[in-house]
Amino acid sequence: MEFSVKSGSPEKQRSACIVVGVFEPRRLSPIAEQLDKISDGYISALLRRGELEGKVGQTLLLHHVPNILSERILLIGCGKERELDERQYKQVIQKTINTLNDTGSMEAVCFLTELHVKGRNTYWKVRQAVETAKETLYTFDQLKSNKTEPRRPLRKMVFNVPTRRELTSGERAIQHGLAVASGIKAAKDLGNMPPNICNAAYLASQARQLADAFSTNIITRVIGEQQMKELGMHSYLAVGHGSQNESLMSVIEYKGNPNPDAKPIVLVGKGLTFDSGGISIKPAEGMDEMKYDMCGAATVYGVMRVVAELQLPLNVIGVLAGCENMPGGRAYRPGDILTTMSGQTVEVLNTDAEGRLVLCDALTYVERFEPEVVIDIATLTGACVVALGHHITGLMSNHNPLAHELIGASEQAGDRAWRLPLGDEFYEQLDSNFADMANIGGRAGGAITAGCFLSRFTRKYSWAHLDIAGTAWRSGKNKGATGRPVALLSQFLLNRAGLNGDD
């Protein structure tokens, strides 16, 4: 799908369709008022007859409006004008894209980017429109034998901006939006792949292909079980013992900073390509969704693609910690004591708390890069879902400025995160009679005790942990990976690169 920006009057557009907003109750947006005036009150007369109230998501498609060059006008309900916020704006764009796609409008000029969204500029509105459009049109049908496509799918969308001065900002927003959307799609595609295809070797192959596609800036190395053993990554290795698929850790290194000595930003993604729970096996219901336990690694892969496509002037390292947790004759057991790469020992009380056992060694491994910051991303705890639902990602950190940066980026990107504490009391829940710590700390505060566990392996650098167990995928009728938090981390890196889109 092609995107562009322009600045022009609605009555001069010869597009197949013009998209304008209507507020509740039956109030025309400024652009809709212009069209109404040119059409001698045609649109307002329809509204007076009750054809459209203006509630969020309502639509009315008009054909051959008097004195208008465009074939059609799509009126889209935007709710109450003063209440139009980020969430409603995205809903309006989503409804617009679906309507255009379903009604055979192959091209359109969209004036919704001229609406006033509280606290948001033109760059944000155009970029969010691009990302939302790509998200709305996303399908995962690679493994279907019969694929259905719209008869006349939407091919081209032009976003109108109020003044010519904002064209440059709009063009930059499209560039950034397309890159972020590409990263989100890559993460979703990986997440939606079935576990009989997407194992640690598949993750490694994708990481290598990324290096091939962006060979100027990216080098990928894959660390297998033999090298992990030599490195002392016994905790990581233990989790994969029950599986016939080899555990593989893929390290994607991007160099974009002109200063070769600049410290890298390191992203570490949990890549459990299937999590049965191991000996502490999960219930059968919903176990199919445990293919999504690698969405942390999928996020890192998606973000590395964004970084490479935008050629950000940063050094970024992405680690995909690939593994599979299965029961078997060689599987690790409750009661085992593991020696981690850091030398600390862990008593295994539950083999279904395996993600932290993989991550702790990966977090120790990345010390060698002398990182600026390290951020791990993991579908780690059901407790985080209980705390924050499926809407907000959990954030923990040992460094206040980093936590504030990530929260700010989450608000900018509309990919929200919320900080949880790492208090001394929670560390006490991890006490073990037989090892330095246990791998679980009981039901109370489970998301926080998991973060406390990881923090014991991050003392040498500034670190943040994103628990995406509630936000990485959807269940039910619309089951599928969400691609979160690719947008959050992409915004964080754009901010670090000084490309935050502020006019």
UniProtKB/Swiss-Prot annotation:
Mn(2+) 2 binds at residues 270, 275, 293, 354. Its EC number is 3.4.11.1, 3.4.11.10. Its cofactor is Mn(2+). InterPro entries: Leucine_aapep/pepB, Macro_dom-like, Peptidase_M17_C, Peptidase_M17_leu_NH2_pept, Peptidase_M17_N. The active site is at 282, 356. It is found in: Cytoplasm. Pfam families: Peptidase_M17, Peptidase_M17_N. GO terms for biological process: proteolysis. Its main location: cytoplasm. NCBIfam families: PRK00913.1-1, PRK00913.1-4. Belongs to the peptidase M17 family. This is Probable cytosol aminopeptidase.
